[in-house]
């Protein structure tokens, strides 16, 4: 048997006021399943200062206490992309309690060895301001039995806030899942560490053409 048999409930909305967007999401979610145990919440960075209140709203209205997520400069939902406007996307999953655990925030790599981390794979969010993020990802990958990690980096014009039951930043956070949870993934974007400091020598808006007079993808 699998640890989750019901489909995810999900919703998304854009509005100038987060309260209106959150209410719209609740209407889309409908009746909250009694078995909902884990929430996923992604919010535009325009609302980073309100993230504590947004998370508290969804905790109280859904009754779900465990949450993961992040802020981003854009929000992708089912067939919709929100850019340059405040928006949010929320999803609820019905997982057996023993099938997942919220990952504590990991800042220096030694935090990985200090935690009793057990899981088959992990969904994670990383703060790009942490200079040791690659070490954290590799270290966590060595601890999950599949060696498989999915997720992405937080993005923001200000604070790279993440959701890990509460609101925090500065490291790697997420959820560990057991082998009882079925997994299907798609790669939407690949990135590589830039290494030392470079000078952008050619660009078109937000697309970098060359670094230090060399093709950017070299």
Where do the PLM segments sit?
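Small-residue-enriched flexible segments
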Residues: 2-52, 56-66, 70-218
């Amino acid at each position: 048997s699998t640890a989750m048999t019901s489909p995810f409930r999900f919703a998304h909305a854009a509005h100038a006021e987060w309260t209106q967007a959150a209410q719209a999401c609740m209407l889309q979610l409908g009746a909250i399943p009694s078995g909902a145990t884990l929430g996923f919440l992604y919010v535009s960075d325009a609302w980073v200062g309100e993230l504590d209140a947004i998370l508290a709203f969804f905790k109280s209205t859904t009754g779900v206490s465990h949450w993961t997520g992040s802020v981003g400069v854009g929000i992708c939902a089912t067939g919709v992309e929100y850019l340059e406007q405040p928006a949010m996307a929320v999803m609820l999953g019905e997982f057996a309690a023993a099938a997942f655990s919220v990952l504590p925030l990991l800042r220096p790599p030694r935090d990985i060895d200090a935690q009793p981390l057990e899981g088959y794979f992990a969904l994670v969010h990383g703060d790009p301001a942490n200079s040791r993020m690659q070490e954290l990802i590799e270290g966590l990958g060595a601890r999950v039995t599949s060696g498989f990690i999915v997720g992405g980096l937080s993005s923001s014009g200000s604070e790279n806030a993440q959701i890990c039951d509460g609101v925090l930043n500065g490291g790697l956070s997420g959820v560990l899942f057991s082998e009882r949870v079925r997994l299907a993934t798609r790669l939407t974007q690949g990135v590589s560490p830039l290494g030392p400091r470079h000078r952008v020598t050619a660009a078109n808006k937000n697309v970098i053409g060359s670094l230090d007079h060399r093709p950017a993808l070299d």
